Amino acid sequence: MKNLNLTKIAMLLLVFLSMGAFAQKNKNIKTAAIKTTIYCDHCKICESCGGRILKELYNEDGIKTTNVDAKANTITVTYDERKITLEQVRIKISRLGFDADAVKADPSAVAKLDDCCKKPS
């Protein structure tokens, strides 16, 4: 009987410890809506902007999910802050040719965008 009680206590302890570790792990996952400026109206399918943003950010270590909302001019990113900082995410977006909050788009990357994705003159 004592062994059975000890086994139950050990299992409960293991469950509580693993729950704590799981909660600790998720604490490092953050989501941010980054303000940008998207000029084309077919952003999700355009390989020069929306599709490229999704593909490039998805391949970045530490980024879990991305979503481009052309109407709201936002890029929502879920990331693991142990692997990448929000500032690094903004710089990555800038290097793709788009503003990212206060980080301005890299001019050489903007030049490579399709005309529909550039600011109208």
PLM features per residue range, with description:
Residues 1-30:
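Bacterial Sec-dependent N-terminal signal peptides
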Residues 27-42:
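Short glycine-/aliphatic-rich beta-strand segments at the starts of folded cytosolic domains
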Residues 53-69:
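Short acidic amphipathic segments
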Residues 38-57, 116-117:
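Short, thiol/selenol-centered motifs that function as redox-active sites or metal-ligating centers
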Residues 51-56, 85-87, 95-98, 120-121:
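Short, low-complexity, polar/charged sequence segments that are solvent-exposed and flexible
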Residues 65-109:
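Mid-chain, structured segments of secreted extracytoplasmic proteins
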Residues 111-121:
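Short, low-order "capping/linker" segments at domain edges
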